[in-house]
């Protein structure tokens, strides 16, 4: 997929590199602009500035929510850089700011009743490609046969990025209250307070942020990609099931297990064994229009698997 960035990179290099080189040469040789050039360009600058002010006024009229700090370049760049530094500092201080947080959670079911809850956090699984939600292909053949299954067809994510959406799934934080995440803990802590033995198993690497923080709240946690020194190690999500079996074998009366899968991230063909390809052909899968059908087949195979 990143190969499609090449044309954009080439254009940027052609536009900016020669200009930067010429500017550097002019500075080194101390070339001076003529007075006539300065007067002419100054007039043009005032015209551009006037047009910019009118455009800015138009933006405020059309969109009452328009903000200079977030919508006007390069002010938004400066704002976002500052915001990144601020959030990095808050993240690094998370363990201190959240240490006294509690849900005050209590179990309401009898202690002798065995309860096992498994929460699966998937990724990049498009609802429109789920048989369960009306997709014409058999991408969920086992789920549709499951009795007592409740599906929610009209659900929207609160973020389109993993580093925000997953922490919100693992806690009671919402998009509107996201800044409170620095002072709160996750659902695993709530279950621990209620007397459950907890486990968190992930098929992703550390991200040094809230997914790690919430996962490490569990009595047992394992980020299986970190178990190998080989950075190219790319296990299938079904490897997590082995850890689930081991956890269930411990025989605790109350268990809460969270699985964070790698889901259907590209390259799709790496998400399932070649022998389990149901929709074919699923190769080649380069991100090109002529391979669209192959890409869809491979993606649907990843959802099905």
Please annotate each region the language model reported.
Residues 242-246, 283-305:
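A long, amphipathic alpha-helix that forms part
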Residues 52-119, 124-286:
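Active-site-proximal alpha/beta segments of enzymes that process anionic O-linked groups
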Residues 1-10, 279, 299-305:
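Short intrinsically disordered, low-complexity coil segments enriched in acidic
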């Amino acid at each position: 997929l990143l190969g499609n960035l090449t044309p954009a990179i080439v254009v940027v290099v052609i536009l900016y590199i020669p200009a930067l080189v010429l500017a550097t040469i002019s500075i080194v040789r101390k070339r001076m602009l003529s007075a006539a050039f300065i007067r002419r360009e100054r007039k043009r600058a005032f015209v551009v500035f006037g047009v910019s002010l009118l455009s800015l006024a138009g933006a405020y009229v059309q969109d009452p929510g328009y903000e200079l700090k977030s919508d006007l370049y390069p002010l938004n760049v400066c704002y976002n850089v500052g915001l990144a530094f601020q959030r990095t500092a808050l993240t690094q201080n998370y363990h201190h700011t959240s240490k006294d947080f509690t849900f005050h959670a209590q179990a309401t079911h009898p202690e002798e009743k065995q309860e096992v809850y498994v929460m699966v956090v998937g990724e990049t699984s498009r609802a429109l490609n789920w048989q369960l939600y009306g997709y014409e292909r058999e991408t969920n053949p086992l789920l549709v046969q499951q009795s007592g299954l409740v599906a929610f067809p009209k659900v929207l994510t609160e973020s389109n990025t993993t580093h925000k959406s997953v922490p919100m799934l693992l806690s009671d934080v919402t998009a509107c209250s996201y800044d409170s995440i620095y002072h709160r803990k996750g659902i695993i802590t709530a279950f621990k307070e209620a007397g459950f033995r907890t486990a968190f198993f992930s098929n992703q690497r550390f991200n040094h942020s809230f997914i790690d923080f919430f996962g490490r709240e569990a009595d047992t946690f394992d980020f299986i990609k970190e178990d190998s020194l080989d950075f190219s190690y790319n296990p299938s999500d079904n490897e997590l099931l082995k850890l689930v079996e081991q956890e269930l074998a411990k025989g605790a009366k109350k268990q809460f297990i969270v699985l964070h899968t790698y889901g259907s991230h590209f390259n799709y063909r790496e998400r399932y064994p070649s022998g389990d390809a149901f929709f074919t052909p699923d190769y080649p899968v380069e991100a090109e229009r002529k391979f669209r059908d192959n890409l869809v087949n491979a993606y649907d195979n990843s959802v099905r698997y």
